[in-house]
Each structure stands twice: as C-alpha cells, then as structure tokens.
Amino acid sequence: MSLFRSTMLRRQLLTSRSVCLRYSSTSTPENVVLPRLQADLKNAMRSKNKPALNTIRAIQAEIINASKTAKPITTDSALYSLIQKQIKSSSASIEEFRNAKREDLVEKEQAQLDVLQGYSGEIPTVGESEIDELVKSALEGLEEGKRSAGHVMGRVMSSIKGRAVDSEYVSKKIQEVVGAK
C-alpha cells in the first residue's frame, strides 16, 4: 500500500471518529416506532401478512425518498406526519373505490389503513388539552395587531417543535380562537 493511500485512510478514520462522537445531546423524545419498522417487516414476512408487509414497505420507501431531501425522517414525530399523510391518502382511495364499487380494493386499502392507524396510535403525540393551552398562551402573548392565524400558528408550532402533533387540530383550534376574537 502506498504512503499516500495509508495516510488518507488514517485521516478518514480520524475524521469520521470525531464526527460520530457526541459529548452532549438535547433532550429529544425517544423514537418508538422508527427503529422497530425493520423488525416488523421481518415479522410480516414470516407470518405472510400481505397488508402489513406492503404498508411497511411503502413507509420505508417514503423514508428512503425523504432521506434524499433536505428533511430526512429521523424521528417519530416526522414519521407521524408521514403516516398521517398516508392515512389521508388511503382514506381518499377508499372513498374512490367505494364510488367505483370495487369492494376488493376497498378491503385491501382498509387493511393497509388499519396498519397505518396502528403505527399512528403508538407514536406519542401532544394532547388536545395541551394544544388548547398553548394556543391561548400564544394568543395572549401577541399584540392586538398581530393576532392573525399565521402569527399564532408560528408561536404554537415553535413551542411544540420536535414533538408529534395533529396539525389539523391545531389549525382548527387556532381558527376558532382567532375567529372568535
């Protein structure tokens, strides 16, 4: 091996070690579902559970696609928003299949929806009562001129940052409170 190559290898090993070390960390919520997806995929393969297998593969494909963008899915809160998006898409598909009288596809999509809802229920989210309190405190902290839905939403979402939350409920609650005042 040449001197240049051995020096480059040593340099790469030293730099990669320093990047991987973490001396302190912020308190982020523990991932529950994300690390378990691979094991669930293997279990679905062993038990020949087609709906779970297809759903987990679709989730993993979305995670891989997102890893190639600026916002990779590395936490359960990001996974929660992905799953909610897929639940919404699946629900719309079920309605379309019902309108087309395709009960076979409705059953297939419903089985996938059940798997998605199972994963969605396992991820800890911000409760509705906490969201209500955050909306009220954000509204009280703003001046009269800046009490628009956008300003309140910005404050609420910045205080929830890093945690899984039902964005539709937050938006609905902000519209109620801002519209009432």
UniProtKB/Swiss-Prot annotation:
Keyword Oxidoreductase: no
Localisation per UniProt entry: Mitochondrion
Transit peptide boundaries: 1-23
UniProt keyword Transport present: no
Gene Ontology terms: cellular component: mitochondrion
GO molecular function: carbon-nitrogen ligase activity, with glutamine as amido-N-donor
Database matches in SUPFAM superfamilies: GatB/YqeY motif
Domain of life from the UniProt record: Eukaryota
Keywords: Mitochondrion, Transit peptide
Primary site of residence: mitochondrion
Pfam families in the cross-refs: YqeY
Family matches, as InterPro entries: Asn/Gln_tRNA_amidoTrase-B-like, GatB_Yqey_C_2, YqeY/Aim41, YqeY/Aim41_N
Stated family: Belongs to the AIM41 family.
PANTHER family: ALTERED INHERITANCE OF MITOCHONDRIA PROTEIN 41, MITOCHONDRIAL
Record protein name field: Altered inheritance of mitochondria protein 41, mitochondrial
The species this protein was found in: Pyrenophora tritici-repentis (strain Pt-1C-BFP) (Wheat tan spot fungus)
